Curated annotation (Swiss-Prot):
Protein's name according to its UniProt entry: Mannosyl phosphorylinositol ceramide synthase regulatory protein CSG2
A Gene Ontology cellular-component term: endoplasmic reticulum
Glycosylation-annotated residues: N35, N49
Pfam families in UniProt: CSG2
InterPro entries: Csg2, EF_Hand_1_Ca_BS
One GO molecular-function entry: enzyme regulator activity
Species of the source: Saccharomyces cerevisiae (strain ATCC 204508 / S288c) (Baker's yeast)
Coiled-coil segments on the chain, per record: none
């Protein structure tokens, strides 16, 4: 599949995931009968319940990573339907010459666990192979990445419970774009071509984001979401401090994705050959992600929120019995998280590492379009907001061309 289709898949998947999770977090009442409703645990505000839904959504997000392995194997079988002729010839040549070679030492550590060993080795030798220095190093790497993802995803879900989906997407993707671009340059992962020109284009993109965020309050006021105090002339926003807190939490939590991106490329992408079968690489990296998900769930288990009252347990049970909750959750996983993660893994192999930062700019643009499509009567567009989107789109197109040069760089 081309990098363009993978790019759209990752961006649209992120938008679907964010909109679905925001729909769950913003739900204030649950229908319990023909005419009856009950407040959600988040609305009740009992001690221990204010973050219970955020915690469970984070836990379920890590659980969805277990589906990456079967999804990648399904993609491996369906891949001949989508690859181009050049990709097919390159992969067939590799299969004939190097089908048995594996260059990733960390995957070799668990190769006898993930696949059937050929030939089979005695149980004692297999046990000694599992308990080795390489195994502990591999588990330590996965644990570090799992801890980073726990912080990033908890802050992401917490921000969605406080702020609208667009505000969260704007803050998170801006922070990730800036920190990843900075660390890729400092750590020598990104290329040194056209550095000053790319810097000017990135500054233009950041200015466009600034204009969009600055005019957002004006758009909300014209749409009736905000009002003006007639006595003071100031905007009256009852959720102002929640929005500010959500933006701060999301922005700071997203910064940790910079070290995650650097460590992932150092540990699991540096040894990938451009001639290695992409389907095999995808299965290996999906296995890494699934193991990170398992470790993340294990770390989260001791911190399961406790409900202080019987009413809290009943409201949680009713919430999970609500069909819209499961439809939104399954939609965020099947049409959001899985396609986005698989596309990001493929893009990270096919294109230069810094090319992935364009997905963050695209997510902001498509999130704005999704808000306009889903809420046309509550969305008002002003001239300066359009100018901001134009600046951001032009920067995205130029960066996609300049950063996307040199495919199959690994």
């Amino acid at each position: 599949m081309s990098t363009t289709l993978l790019w759209f898949s990752s961006v649209i998947g992120y938008v679907i995931q964010t909109k679905c999770l925001s729909n769950i977090q913003s739900k204030k009442e649950i229908s319990v009968g023909p005419n009856g409703t009950i407040a959600t645990p988040e609305t009740n505000g009992d001690n221990g319940n204010s973050s219970s839904l955020t915690f469970y959504l984070t836990f379920m997000y890590f659980a969805s990573w277990l589906l990456l392995v079967p999804a990648s194997r399904l993609w491996e079988k369906m891949r001949p339907m989508f690859v181009s002729d050049s990709d097919s010839n390159r992969n067939s040549q590799f299969d004939n010459n190097n089908s048995g070679s594996v260059t990733n030492e960390d995957v070799d550590t668990f190769s006898h666990v993930l696949d059937d060993p050929q030939p089979r080795i005695p149980a004692q030798q297999q046990k000694q192979k599992i308990i080795s220095v390489a195994t502990f190093k591999y588990v330590a790497k996965l644990t570090v990445l799992a801890l980073i993802m726990i912080v990033a995803d908890l802050t992401y879900n917490m921000a969605l419970s406080l702020s609208p989906a667009f505000d969260v997407a704007l803050m998170q993707n801006t922070a990730i774009f800036e920190i990843v671009t900075l660390l890729y340059g400092v750590c020598g992962i990104s290329r040194k071509n056209y550095v000053f020109r790319n810097f000017l284009i990135m500054m233009n993109a950041v200015i466009g984001i600034l204009i969009i965020s600055y005019t957002k309050a004006t758009c909300d006021m014209l749409a009736g979401k905000l009002s003006v105090n007639p006595n003071t002339g100031e905007l009256s926003d009852p959720f102002l401090f929640d929005r500010l807190k959500g933006a701060l939490i999301c922005g700071l939590g997203a910064l940790i994705m910079g070290p995650f991106a650097v460590l992932w490329n150092r540990w699991f992408c540096s040894n990938i050959s451009k001639n290695e079968n992409s389907a095999v690489v995808l299965v290996k990296q999906s296995t890494h992600m699934a193991l990170i998900g398992i470790i993340g769930m294990v770390i989260l288990l001791p911190f399961i929120p406790k409900f202080p009252s019987r009413e809290s347990v009943e409201s949680i049970s009713l919430f999970y019995n609500d069909k819209s909750f499961w439809f939104s959750l399954l939609g965020s996983i099947i049409f959001g998280s899985l396609p986005s993660l698989i596309s990001i893994l493929e893009l990270n192999r096919k294109a230069p590492a810094e090319y992935l930062t364009t997905c963050n700019l695209g997510a902001i643009i498509f999130m704005g379009l999704a808000e306009w499509v889903c809420e046309p009567t509550q969305t008002t567009i002003v001239r300066w907001e359009v100018i901001g989107y134009i600046m951001l789109t032009v920067s995205l197109l130029v960066l996609s061309v300049t950063l996307g040069e040199g495919k199959y760089h690994h």
